[in-house]
Amino acid sequence: MKTLRTTVLITLILGAALSAEGQKAKSNGNVKSLVVSEEKYDMLVKKQYKESETYYDIKGNITENISYKQGKVNKHFKYEYDSDNNKIREQEFDASGRLKESSEYKYENGLRTEKTVYDSNKKIKSKKTYVYTTF
């Protein structure tokens, strides 16, 4: 039981540290990009794979995120922001770099009011509206 508690505690601490690490990049305008690689050992043979690439703008917003699976592109997203740092556009690309779908966002008073998803031909796939109740 004590081992289980210790394991849970270590997991929580590591999770908080990794979360804080990601937040630092968001708040620090000095980070331009981050590349994460992983080394795996199989029968004493070292294999190194790129795990992810993340690029930031001068304000610390993520502008591009590429994740890899065994060294090959798995997911690829690009993001655009308005002057208030609200995400206004998100594009998803396939492994070959072709646009799969894109989303556009609208805001009022800093609150997201609409999300429209388009296919690769700019045809609307879905539209979501957000209605807020305020005090």
Q: Positions of the model-derived regions?
A:
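Bacterial Sec-dependent N-terminal signal peptides
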Residues: 1-25
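Buried hydrophobic residues that stabilize the cores of well-folded domains
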Residues: 21-135
